């Protein structure tokens, strides 16, 4: 691992920073409301047709617009999925979904989770994939970025009452950022062999004389926004492990870059908009250090594999189970950490087949709130919540009122911060307990013991933190799990967004105080260390007991027996 593993990590980080820096500058211009002549007429036409006034909104108006927009998206997608059997672009004549699966899927894609309790090629028509899921991939990503825009403006402005206009932000993010970049990525994917057609499925005879069905469809267009918007829902059931969805090592590398591109660019944009690039760099350093350590641990665990294989005559202990040979262990490990550090959930291997330690790291990255770069928008505002918590703890230690970027952090801000940080762990732990205490929940567990517990814990962690990946050994297409996970996804998304916008509404009205002798510098290595420590401390205190019952116990069972 020493040479090739670290070379892969280094090349990934270098290319990521090279691409995200200029995009961060462009996003900063969007946040500050600079006009762009290229699509100004299109934008103006949309306002005329919709009757929307582009006047700025206060925090509660912004939150109400975001919430209503997403609730409407759930209703429309639910109806489409239920009615797909009677609609066009359905060459395989697939019927509509059951009501509980349709509800779960609608909530999943609107909340940017993309949890899939179904296999796309066997369940969804082309119309549902294009007009339903792909559209929500764009809109859910735009929602997360818009909330991040509002919070950044709250730190940059002072003595103000407004955070921007939600409708303007959603449209401009989609028109100027998501659509152009997704088009470029889709063309790259097509060049690598990703499908993009509306043909019916192919029925062929293999060389062995066996009949086989090859699914077709508009894959590349959905795949591009799947990774760019950190959505993660695959066109096929195997997701990015499927050769029609992720055929080459290059397409695999592009997917990983696309997942982190906007989250990293938003950190650069944050520093530029608040007038101190060191603030954005500090966030990137904290995220990068946690990320690199996580990748190294997963690579080590998967290369170490299972010690019981060598005595049985295996050539290597390394764990290739559930992995694609065209990617190998190192690229697969990197992808697993990227997709769970971000709220993406796309997979190019089966996480359920990882070693206990290798599977624990992706699980833990979700449980800390996916703040290591994180989802588009959600990663930045999630890490800024930990920044506020860090300056509060530092203020307690030195006996000063906490402040960040010249703004005092008061009781209301800390209440909302605590609420936003604690809502997802509460859902995860209560949901896991409910699943294990009921017959309907236990019925879906395939593997007994510690790994079966890990499957349930992973499902709730993935849903509540809007990731969408899974330990696929758990059978979740049941009314119990569809409804439980739908509730977890909805509360996990908006139970964080609403407190974040409440914090933004509070901060934007405050005056900016000049830095004094007792002000904690938040752009240096000391603060980066404090921030990392806070993230690790909160994650440890919350989830160590649950992790001890699952992946830690499983890891000890394997190695102590050896």
Swiss-Prot record:
- Give the protein family: Belongs to the KdpA family.
List, alphabetically, the InterPro entries matched: KdpA (IPR004623)
Q: Which Pfam families match?
A: KdpA (PF03814)
Self-association or partners: how does it assemble?
The system is composed of three essential subunits: KdpA, KdpB and KdpC.
Q: What does this protein do?
A: Part of the high-affinity ATP-driven potassium transport (or Kdp) system, which catalyzes the hydrolysis of ATP coupled with the electrogenic transport of potassium into the cytoplasm. This subunit binds the periplasmic potassium ions and delivers the ions to the membrane domain of KdpB through an intramembrane tunnel.
Membrane topology of the entry: Multi-pass membrane protein
Q: Name one GO molecular function term.
A: potassium ion binding
Q: Which superkingdom heads the taxonomic lineage of this protein's source?
A: Bacteria
Q: Where in the cell is it found?
A: Cell inner membrane
Which residue windows are transmembrane per the record?
Answer: 6-26, 63-83, 132-152, 175-195, 253-273, 283-303, 327-347, 356-376, 379-399, 416-436, 483-503, 526-546
**What name has this protein been given in UniProt?**
Potassium-transporting ATPase potassium-binding subunit
What GO cellular component entries does it have? plasma membrane
* Keyword Ion transport appears in the UniProt entry: yes
Per UniProt, the keywords (alphabetical) are: Cell inner membrane, Cell membrane, Ion transport, Membrane, Potassium, Potassium transport, Transmembrane, Transmembrane helix, Transport
Q: What is its main location?
A: membrane
Keyword Zinc-finger appears in the UniProt entry = no
